[in-house]
């Protein structure tokens, strides 16, 4: 028993190089990070080429927002692969892995905090939504990511982990409401409803996978290993970010006139004109 306690202490005080060694020894975890880094690099080059012919400021703004998604991802995944944003956490009593030290790639939450608002910004611009609705969606999204990080890092109480998880899901419901209820009408008025509907469905379905993975992974009930969970997150990121962004930019490049005519200012609101 004392030996186990000593080992636990060593893990908790592990240096960055030791964490890196642990990552590299886990093939599933390590490969899930480097595959994403490689794809992000390819996507960045592709998006640069796709945006070269854009002329209108609105189309360029959508391009910049979309471009930031792989830029944030490659930076964040590099932090994960280097061990910079990964650490060991001792799970609290009541957790399936109570008393054990679990490798926590908490840097993923940094990726989501900075990249998912850009996805929503691009979608909001595409739908020509009003500033208030766009601000609501982005702030709710940031709240979702931050409370998700809290749920992953809390080790003082197993109950509190799930409390933060519930709060994060509540923020997520607010984001879903905006995407499913408010913005479709704006997109219809802006003439972008067809592509918006496709991207909305892709986003909603894939984003629902993240809280499910959290609950099933080592942070939740621990039915999935860290490596399997990491591949799940990486797969969702590839589809929800890179595939989403490619579909959006391809449509914008082919329909720049529609994007330009959708609205000349962010605060115009595509669904209804402002009262005089």
Swiss-Prot record:
Residues that span the membrane, as ranges: 26-51, 58-81, 106-127, 131-154, 158-180, 193-216, 226-254
Organism superkingdom: Archaea
Keyword Membrane: yes
Coiled coil feature spans: none
Keywords: Cell membrane, Chloride, Chromophore, Ion transport, Membrane, Photoreceptor protein, Receptor, Retinal protein, Sensory transduction, Transmembrane, Transmembrane helix, Transport
Residues on Cytoplasmic side: 52-57, 128-130, 181-192, 255-276
InterPro entries named in the record: Arc/bac/fun_rhodopsins, Rhodopsin_retinal_BS
Membrane topology, as annotated: Multi-pass membrane protein
Predominant location: membrane
GO biological process, one term: phototransduction
Keyword Cell membrane attached: yes
Gene3D superfamilies per UniProt: Rhodopsin 7-helix transmembrane proteins
Localization per record: Cell membrane
Pfam families on file: Bac_rhodopsin (PF01036)
Cellular component annotations (GO), alphabetically ordered: plasma membrane
Residue positions where N6-(retinylidene)lysine is found in the record: 241
Propeptide boundaries: 1-21
Residue ranges annotated as Extracellular topological domain: 22-25, 82-105, 155-157, 217-225
GO function term, MF aspect, one: photoreceptor activity
Role played: Light-driven chloride pump.
Similarity comment text for this entry: Belongs to the archaeal/bacterial/fungal opsin family.
Designated name of the protein: Cruxhalorhodopsin-3
Organism of derivation: Haloarcula vallismortis (Halobacterium vallismortis)
Gene this protein is translated from: choP3
